[in-house]
Amino acid sequence: MQRKITIIASAAVAVAAIAAGVIFATGALTLTQQNNVNDEGNNINNTAQTTEQDGNDKLEVIASFFPLYDFARHVGGDRAQVSSLIPVGIEPHDWEPTAQNIVALQNADMFIFNGAGFEGEWITQIETNLKVDTSTGIQLLEGGEDEAHQEEPLGQEDTAAVTTDPHIWLDPVLAKHQVEVIRDAFIQLDLENSSYYRDNAARYISELESIDASIKSELLSSDCNLKDFIAFHDAFSYFANRYNLTQHSVQGISPEGGEILPQRIIQIRDLATQLGIDTIYSEDLVDPRLATVVANEIPNGRVLTLSPIEGVDKEELDQGIGYIQKMRENIDNLKVGLKCQ
């Protein structure tokens, strides 16, 4: 199915003990990314993270990273071979494709990407049969803007240009929009099976609506004592905006960017103490030790995971864990941090 179509659719902190990965350099605290992915997992874009089918009549679909892969495989079902461009266990910010990736994209029937600047400039140079930008039609937030529910990343000087916040998939309502865009793209390529894609999308959207209802009932009730939480990086603005919560973050839009100043750790500690926060959220694809350092400075402090759902590890992939399950884990961990009874 190779017709050329392009759509834009839809304090003092003791850190010496962890010098192996958390290093003071010229007065700044720098984290190294956690790299515990095995070689087998790194081949995920062509093997492990591909839906299982062998027929030549299947649509060849590539999604830029995990949540879009998960959305697309639920919509495409057994009529599509869906793979993820970014390998398993890899933090996708600032990732760039290899020559092999580009060839695969050129041969695909459909390339689904997040948009809103998430994939970087390379996305504009990709030529493929059908490019699907899932951010089209969404009112985007700008990184660093508070929208009444986002605090500037703690201790970060306002020296960088404001950037678009790409983390739309973390709002289940906007994720529903992305699924609808993907559904329409499948129908555009395979009109004969439109009812199949509509039915698959409807089932998955029902699951997203259930997650939305769970968040409202479990996190927004009077049983929750807090409305503020501290995420590791600035990924939850859309989520916080949707559910009337306030996100504070240790780092900015990208979890890999910049140095972490010692005084910033003190700021986080002081803010947490002021607001009664005892939970610092780490992430599943970055080194958790900084969050542990901060949590150790807070009375009764602890570290839990708040996943930006940018990827899964190989074990989770093998277990069939997807967006819905990761969001459910986030709800459970937020209930602890927000002190919900």
Each model region followed by its residue ranges:
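Extracytoplasmic metal-acquisition and chelation regions
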Residues: 2-341
